[in-house]
Amino acid sequence: MTVKLVFLGKLGDLAGTDERSVEAPLGWQGLIDELQGPIGEAVQQDRTRIALNGALLADKTALNAVSGDEVALLPPVSGG
């Protein structure tokens, strides 16, 4: 029983992969525990967003993923 993590943009570079499977269920603290180093720090930044099965979470600390879910980690958007 797993949850698929998808790392978009520069978060994929920090994670060293575009996708990774982790054990379900997965909450915010479990996600932080799974992601160590620069990727873990980046995910905790206010501007980094999380989508659960394609829907952006208003409060990423409310993450509650179960087996078969996809959690996408979105880097801050920049532009001019």
What is each PLM-predicted segment?
Residues 1-79:
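Ubiquitin-like/PB1-type beta-grasp interaction modules and other compact soluble beta-rich domains
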